[in-house]
């Protein structure tokens, strides 16, 4: 039977380097979780951090930046579910992740995540700032899970109130 325990970024990145098909280890994180069996062997790891997009509020949204497994059955679903529970306990309103358009997302769906959008993909490289591309640049599928609906509703009400005040209502 698999269980989830917290882990360090160093341990998580070592496993990402071994198992992840197309991304290198990460630089920063908020938390990382390890999926182990009854004798303590690791079968998967998830690293959760700030959203990559600057347009998304890093204090309200957590983002799964890496999830890697050795192929053990249900490890992905277990880790996605555990990451959402930890992010909820930390007070985040939602959690999100992006997967390749060639991946099914069945583990995310099994963990209660919902498909939200298709991103354009692309690269962070620009003429003014060339960057070496290491990851696939094709379209990505965005999945999210709402964690603290009351907090999300409160934020929406505050935004609506600010809009009414702006127009003198």
Model region roles, listed by residue range:
Residues 1-26:
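Short amphipathic alpha-helix that is part of the acyltransferase structural core
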Residues 6, 30, 36-37, 49-139:
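Acyl-donor binding region in acyl/amide transferases
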Residues 16, 29-46:
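Conserved beta-hairpin
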Residues 20, 24, 72, 88-91, ...:
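Secondary-structure transition/hinge residues
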Residues 124-160:
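C-terminal "cap" of GNAT-fold acetyltransferases
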Residues 157-169:
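Short, cationic low-complexity segments
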